[in-house]
């Protein structure tokens, strides 16, 4: 058994919902995305007010992922450009609490996580996973699924500190010794 700090990373480090921010990157460059914007706004609203179940989240993202995402020809280059622009938004408090054994468990997609985790030197992380050919979720790291996925991948881990921006992570809070709720640069210990 080993203890660690766990982060619901990208939303708390950057503020906002990373997949939505990435999709908005295309609003400026690709008019085909505009037909998905109303649905993406609804997703943002529902996520902000914790109005999703896992099944509803999968369904909500499906039309965007299956209708638009799989047709992006420059995805890898676009991810690099996205992080070139957004890496500086990582909140400075993270460097103060960072540990070498940190694990990131995030609802963000693996294709977005891979690049930023490599840049900042985080080796242990897991996120949602999307089949790039079909646009379907292979794994959705959201709500109670986070605990299930975490326990499958790190069966001997004990969570000392858990940092999150959302009460949606109640299931992760329940298995953590200490919980910190993050709002921008403000961190409040709630457990």
Tell me what each language-model feature is.
Residues 16-19, 23, 27-92:
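A metal-dependent, Asp-based hydrolase signature
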Residues 77-191:
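C-terminal cap/substrate-recognition subdomain and adjoining C-terminal extension
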Residues 1-4, 8:
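Single conserved hydrophobic/aromatic residue that forms the stacking wall/gate
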